[in-house]
């Protein structure tokens, strides 16, 4: 079976590299990352390159628990907004313990590039802490690795991997290098509904995330 993570060391460049193909939240993958960061600190490497190109997502806990949490003594708070339409979306958010606010309270002064079309039909919004929901990082004291992080991205970066990119950019955790991501990382799990007559189930994005 092909490994989900690929690690390389470049001692002459004082840098190391890890490619993460999927956000699995697998304990074995997590241990490999924790050992990797500890090794970088022990060897005094200045740069850590995290390559998430082609990573279409998975579980956000993978990067929270094994990438950001272990390497930030105190994670700065970064608020994002998600726009909602309709009662069902609001009720779905409440299942996650998040209360929607009326759209009239959206701080437009913080969103100067927001397109008016994005607000059409929108009646409420959520404040998403660190891109998803209220996050409790398993912070390490001291952090496992204190060097500089670089995050490689492309257009296939989506969902859970996109939330890492958004969070890393807003918080300053890493310098992003590459292409614009595919999005859909700001928010929570897709809404699931079933048609009343056929019983066919479908899912769709819970809202529109704003970076």
Where are these regions (language model features)?
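Alpha-helix-centered segments that form part of catalytic cores
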Residues: 106-147
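Catalytic-core segments of thiol-dependent peptidases
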Residues: 56-57, 138-140, 155-156
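Flexible, low-complexity junctional segments that flank or bridge functional domains
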Residues: 1-83, 88-101, 148-150, 163, ...
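Catalytic cores of nucleophile-dependent amide-cleaving enzymes
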Residues: 136, 145-160
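Cysteine-centered nucleophilic/redox motifs
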Residues: 157-172
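A structural signal for short secondary-structure junctions
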Residues: 143-144, 169-170, 195-198
């Amino acid at each position: 079976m092909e490994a989900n993570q690929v690690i390389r060391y470049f001692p002459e460049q004082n840098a190391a590299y890890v490619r993460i193909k999927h956000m699995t939240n697998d304990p074995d993958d997590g241990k490999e990352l924790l050992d990797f960061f500890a090794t970088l600190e022990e060897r005094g490497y200045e740069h850590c390159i995290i390559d998430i190109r082609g990573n279409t997502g998975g579980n956000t806990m993978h990067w929270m628990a094994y990438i950001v949490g272990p390497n930030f003594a105190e994670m700065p708070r970064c608020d994002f907004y998600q726009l909602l339409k309709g009662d069902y979306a609001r009720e779905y958010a409440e299942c996650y313990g998040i209360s929607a606010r009326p759209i009239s309270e959206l701080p437009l002064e913080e969103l100067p590039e927001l397109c008016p079309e994005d607000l059409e039909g929108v009646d409420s919004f959520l404040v998403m802490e660190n891109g998803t929901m209220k996050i409790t990082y398993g912070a390490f004291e001291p952090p496992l690795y204190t060097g500089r992080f670089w995050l490689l991205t492309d257009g296939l970066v989506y969902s859970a991997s996109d939330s890492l990119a958004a969070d890393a950019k807003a918080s300053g955790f890493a310098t992003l290098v590459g292409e614009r991501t595919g999005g859909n990382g700001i928010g929570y799990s897709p809404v699931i509904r079933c048609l009343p007559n056929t019983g066919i189930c479908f899912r769709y994005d819970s809202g529109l995330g704003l970076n």
